[in-house]
Amino acid sequence: MTNNDKIVAIVTSIAVICISLTVIFCDTLVLAVGVPTLVLLWLVFLGWINNKKLDKGEMRRAITGSIVIAFFIILIAISKNPDIYSNNKEIFSLFFGMVTTIIGYYFGYRSGKESKNSSGNE
């Protein structure tokens, strides 16, 4: 096991513990903000530890990951308390549209990049 693998394992363990403690002991607002922020920081760290620099792809991955986590937290909150959605329909509709756009852009960019790389290798 290399030093990078050990560091990644330690930071991942710390991230899982922090996220678990946030889920168990915090209210919904802290959960909705804290967990995506922790995921963002964790994904940025994983991108940085790979080659000691961050490129656009690493930041896209980190931002997409944190927004998708926020999306799932909102879905769970709505399933537990449907009144949240009925009181804030416009905000949730805008957020769901934003998430759809971000995911489409992320995967569209990746597939375009992969097809460009595969056509360049032939």
Swiss-Prot record:
Membrane-spanning intervals of the chain: 7-27, 29-49, 62-82, 89-109
InterPro entries linked: Cytb/b6-like_sf (IPR027387)
Disulfide links within the chain: none
Main location class: membrane
Species of origin: Methanocaldococcus jannaschii (strain ATCC 43067 / DSM 2661 / JAL-1 / JCM 10045 / NBRC 100440) (Methanococcus jannaschii)
Organism ancestry: Archaea, Methanobacteriati, Methanobacteriota, Methanomada group, Methanococci
GO cellular component: plasma membrane
Topological type in the membrane: Multi-pass membrane protein
Keywords, ordered alphabetically: Cell membrane, Membrane, Transmembrane, Transmembrane helix
Top-level taxon in the UniProt lineage: Archaea
Subcellular locations according to the entry: Cell membrane
Protein name: Uncharacterized protein MJ0321
